[in-house]
């Protein structure tokens, strides 16, 4: 008897999107009908978290199943340093990545979208079909240089539409070869949420969709002292005149309704793209043989806690829910029951092990030092043991999050930059407003959580990339001044 064909996998990832930016997660102003429908046809995870709230580290963790202190990518890989990278440099080359494992198992593999893990001109990590943009971050959604299997050209239209078109074409081609399973990685470069990409009115077919929306789903909080501290810090270390970003935008965007509506419209454009991908699967007869996963690289504050952006949008880095809580929806008609939700604490990094177990490939790689856990039984509706905990890290900040507590430990090895810890009681303070760290009444729980956090990083952090012990970051770090103060000017 012939071996049963393994299911296809489509893994869709957005760029800078909190779970809160979807209708199915409770945002009444967001128009996301296709993703809401996808959630109704599958399972929605309400407590999914990324391990790091920056683009490159979180993507590396999904591809490798490892934390940043293991794979060495601690922040976004700076496009301005690309000419300093070795030819063909791949930030996760030494690891057995998800596409490489599936390729060995007979899968056709495609990556269509934002890569941001190294050199872009040629395919990496066992990818057969390679389509990406010529830079990691998005300055404009239009007029981007694209690379299609080694050939480069400028695409005048919207990059999200381009990636959708290419994904649909790929699925149509795979439908002609239904006996060969495929992996399609589709990391969109939207909705993004930063100037200049969302400054002004959106120039696409959903550009006017939110013209009459009051945007009450975006908090109007005062700018936090931590956001201002980052702005002041970066005026010295990463000023615009030195080629760095204009951090004043982080203070201005929450009060610019046009930009907010632009950002929301970019998400609706992606929602439409996801719908086209799902339609292509159905049209090609692949719907019942494909597991589709939708998630984001990391969360994004829309003004919550007085800042706009990701985990490193404040000084010190924050570990609040809004910056780490991501959407996670999984649909596989006939294999995963419809209209389900899960409250389990899971990580996007866990997708590595989950996909492998779901496909029956868990034994095809060495998992000894892989902290990613498999929640595949949850997809099947099975009963299984699960520890509701996720671990997070953002250079100088590390955290453990349980159903009851969020504890943030900060690096203490710098005399010039003293940092304090955070502790939040999530039952009494779900919005994470009252810091209990240092309160004698909570000293025991703080010690317990600190012990668990330290044990986790003692077990998994690679000394080469453990910043807290003098290790380095691949390509670049976001807080070099801190690490030079701690470890010396040659760090």
Model-based region annotation:
Residues 123-126, 133, 194-201, 279-336, ...:
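Histidine-centered active-site microenvironments of extracellular/periplasmic hydrolases
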Residues 5-20, 37-39, 62, 102, ...:
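Beta-strand elements within well-structured catalytic alpha/beta cores of enzymes
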Residues 74-104, 108, 116-260, 264, ...:
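Formylglycine-dependent
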Residues 1-7, 14, 18-19, 44, ...:
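Long, internal low-complexity/basic segments
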Residues 123, 128-129, 134-137, 300-311, ...:
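C-terminal cap/loop subdomain of S1 sulfatases and analogous C-terminal strand-loop tails that border
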Residues 7, 11-14, 18-110, 135-138, ...:
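Active-site segment of extracytoplasmic enzymes that catalyze sulfate/phosphate-ester chemistry
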Residues 63, 136-153, 275-279, 283, ...:
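Substrate-binding rim/cap in mid-to-C-terminal beta-strand-loop elements of soluble/periplasmic
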Residues 14, 24-29, 43-67, 74, ...:
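Short, solvent-exposed turn/loop segments enriched in Gly/Ser/Thr/Pro and often Arg
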